[in-house]
Design a protein with these regions (language model features):
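Residues lining hydrophobic/aromatic ligand-binding pockets adjacent to catalytic sites
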Residues: 1-248
Length: 248
């Protein structure tokens, strides 16, 4: 069995504090995605959590990003910010109707970030998972669920995810539990404890640890590792430092 691909990236690309730090001075804002998609191998799009994006935007992003690059897409808040996830069928259909299948092979996983108050309810979560499409426009979809309540650290939840090849997102966070489970043929991690006092966001020991973990994930399939929160200004440097350690 061949090893999987490790993709490392950041959340979004339009972040003013990155200008002059990650992006060169006076770099055109219109070309920030072009720059970021060549420095990283994946980007997590957060704007889709708040609303649909225009078909023209998806087409443009597909054209700008290089071959081999992938976008992870955050599922709409209207799908996940509710007490009964089983009732989100219409919102899920609306989310998948915005046209991002035009990304083709540049379409990465769909991230479903549950509300921090959402507790594990087997019937509700099973019904929600049943609503998630397996394909879109001929593309096989990958789904990743980010549970942010400790009640999801439950074999019953892992079993539901494993049955649909859904990854359980690993959070490195001061606020949310780190729930790790082998439930899919890919891994998804969101690293959220970067410090502004450390130029690379995380210190050497932490980055070495993440690199070792990524090497283990690679043995079973692809992995997606995003530097997301904490001192976001350090996210690109953290991602590049991890890429350098892994040679990817």
């Amino acid at each position: 069995m061949s090893e999987g691909t490790i993709r490392i990236g950041i959340g979004g690309w339009n972040f003013p504090p990155w200008r002059g730090v990650f992006y060169p001075d006076k770099h055109p804002q219109a070309k920030e995605l072009e720059y970021a998609s060549r420095a990283m191998t994946a980007i997590e799009i957060n704007a889709t959590f708040y609303g649909r994006q225009k078909p023209k935007s998806w087409q443009n992003w597909e054209q700008v990003a290089p071959p081999g690059f992938q976008f992870a897409i955050k599922g709409s808040r209207y799908c996940v910010s509710r007490s009964k996830l089983a009732e989100s069928a219409d919102s899920i259909a609306n989310f998948f109707g915005q046209g991002f299948e035009v990304l083709g092979p540049k379409l990465g996983p769909i991230l479903w970030q549950f509300a921090k108050f959402k507790r594990f309810d087997r019937d509700d979560i099973a019904a929600f998972i049943d609503l998630l499409p397996g394909t879109l426009g001929g593309i096989t979809l990958r789904h990743a669920i980010e549970p942010r309540h400790k009640s999801f650290d439950d074999p019953a939840f892992f079993e539901l995810c494993r049955a649909r090849n859904i990854a359980v997102v690993l959070d490195d966070s001061d606020e949310y539990p780190a729930i790790e489970a082998d439930t899919a043929d890919f891994a998804y991690a969101r690293l959220q404890r970067m410090s502004e006092d450390v130029l690379t966001g995380y210190d050497d020991a932490a980055l070495d640890g993440f690199a070792a973990r990524a090497c283990e994930w690679r043995k079973r399939g692809d992995s997606y590792i995003f530097m997301i929160n904490g001192a976001k200004v350090r996210a690109p440097a953290a991602a590049l430092a991890l890429r350098d350690r892994l040679g990817v």
